[in-house]
């Protein structure tokens, strides 16, 4: 019997998030249970109800209150797709001001695979903090794979298959 694979999928506000349902379909076909958390801005770009119906779990944006049950099962892997300039820089610095960043920060100490799939404008990749923060995340065992310009979700699914 194979072990259940649960992916905590964090989504950020970059154009690929508009097609995140396609990635979720592919991940589910590959045997993943997908639990979605969105940054506050990404939450305004996506259809949270449709994605909750697709995954079977609520799309989380806000922290739960003390005593409230955890709405998602424990993750066996975490991925941030698309990972934006803002989230990469905040995450690398340990900033924990949103649920999405909280999940990413906790994942670094959880002993599970963590993947980042950046989608960042070329001008922003030239910013001096970007490379430094990507290296910092890689040093913390985050697997970094830039999203291809043609947005082939199979790249992400392939990388996560071995998580």
Question: Which residues are covered by each model-predicted region?
Answer:
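A cross-family phosphate/adenosyl-ligand binding-site feature
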Residues: 1-163
């Amino acid at each position: 019997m194979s072990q259940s694979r649960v992916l905590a999928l964090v989504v950020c506000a970059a154009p690929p998030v508009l097609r995140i349902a396609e990635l979720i379909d592919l991940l589910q076909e590959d045997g993943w249970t997908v639990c979605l958390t969105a940054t506050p801005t990404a939450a305004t770009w996506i259809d949270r109800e449709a994605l909750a119906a697709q995954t079977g779990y609520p799309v989380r944006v806000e922290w739960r209150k003390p005593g409230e049950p955890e709405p998602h099962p424990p993750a066996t892997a975490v991925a941030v797709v698309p990972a934006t300039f803002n989230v990469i820089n905040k995450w690398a610095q340990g900033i924990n001001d949103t649920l999405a960043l909280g999940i990413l920060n906790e994942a670094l100490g959880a002993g599970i695979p963590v993947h980042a799939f950046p989608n960042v404008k070329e001008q922003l990749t030239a910013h001096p903090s970007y490379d430094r923060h990507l290296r910092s995340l890689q040093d913390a065992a985050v697997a970094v794979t830039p999203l291809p310009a043609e947005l082939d979700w199979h790249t992400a699914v392939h990388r996560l298959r071995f998580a």
